[in-house]
Design a protein with these regions (language model features):
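Extracytoplasmic/secretory soluble proteins
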Residues: 1-341
Length: 341
């Protein structure tokens, strides 16, 4: 499909009363911000941003430039401007966080909700379906392939654990941390299981037992497990659902577990396969002293542009000119550092 078809779908969710309450109170799409606060920045509204990358990025020769000050970003802002003016995008997207957006999407009260939602792949597909089912909302979700105008959904760089060098010239402390934490984190056995699934007997078990989720409600479900069968137990913070994971997502482990414990559902696996097929790697994140010093100020200037163009319907060229005047010296210093090598 292409942009025009996608936008027509959003307008249908906006204008054709999908919640059936006779009121004009639904939207085509919503997101946690018109631009993300962290890389890859565009992932919650990918069809609008398409191949624009509104941060420091690099060309095919490896030369860094400011991706916000580009025609691609201007075009994306104009698409967002039109959607805001048409009432297609939830205006609360300007200030909502991810928790706000997903809870509005699966809420039992669908007035004020929206149709299209871009979120994380993998086990989050299960979370969305489970929460919609729990709230009595139709969970027949359809995954959308990328529109023709974009290369694919962005596969962001993974968050990482780091050991900070204390600068004393002696690596023994850092090596000890690596040996105690990282080596055991991926030992394929007991400690990795703790990182992935949590504590035995509390988050998971291999003992015979009966587990009931949503006990006493119309969503009550019973699970029977035999002795020796690995299974997850009740979520300590939500007795209507089973526990899913600890710090490491079991569907994206870089080292397999020797005990063969497996919890990823078919839905999670299908979602991961779909994403792998339809995604491209996001650009590497930029890092230098200038970004540390000026990143917040530059992001504030970007948000001024977005508010002026998207929310107020202002002129995109004038807003971008103001961005350049505000940030030029900082951007030049950052690009000088990034391209120094």
């Amino acid at each position: 499909t292409d942009w025009d078809s996608y936008y027509a779908m959003l307008k249908a969710f906006t204008e054709q009363d999908p919640d059936g309450n006779g009121k004009n109170d639904t939207y085509g799409v919503a997101a946690a911000g018109f631009i993300g606060s962290e890389a890859p920045y565009t992932n919650y509204l990918p069809q609008f941003w398409q191949n624009a990358y509104p941060s420091f990025t690099y060309d095919e020769s490896g030369v860094w430039y400011d991706g916000f000050n580009t025609q691609e970003t201007k075009d994306a802002l104009l698409r967002l401007q039109q959607a805001y003016a048409d009432g297609v995008i939830d205006p609360e997207s300007l200030t909502m966080g991810t928790k706000d957006v997903r809870e509005k999407w699966w809420s039992s009260d669908q007035s004020g909700s929206f149709g299209a939602f871009t979120y994380w792949s993998g086990y989050w597909n299960d979370n969305l379906v489970n929460n919609m089912d729990k709230n009595g909302v139709d969970s027949g979700l359809a995954r959308l392939t990328p529109i023709a105008e974009m290369d694919g959904y962005l596969n962001r760089e993974s968050p990482v654990y780091c050991i900070i060098d204390d600068g004393d010239g002696d690596d023994s402390r850092e090596q000890a941390i690596f040996d105690a934490v990282f080596e055991t984190m991926f030992d394929g056995g007991t400690v990795q299981t703790l990182w992935v699934y949590g504590a035995e007997g509390y988050h998971w078990s291999t003992e015979a037992e009966t587990i009931v989720t949503g006990e006493g409600t119309d969503k009550e479900k019973t699970y029977e497990y035999k002795d020796g069968e690995f299974h997850l137990r009740l979520n300590p913070s939500d007795p209507s659902a089973l526990w899913k994971k600890n710090a490491i997502d079991p569907s994206s482990m870089i080292c397999s577990l020797e005990n063969g414990f497996e919890s990823a559902t078919d839905l999670t696996k299908e979602c991961n396969e779909f994403f792998s097929e339809h995604s491209v790697d996001a650009p590497h994140s930029a890092s230098c002293d200038g970004i540390t010093n000026y990143g917040g100020t530059i992001n504030d200037a970007k948000n001024v542009v977005i508010a002026e163009v998207v929310v107020k319907g202002g002129d995109v060229d004038a807003a971008m000119d103001n961005y350049v005047k505000t940030t030029q010296d900082m951007v030049d210093e950052i690009l000088g550092q990034l391209n120094a090598d």
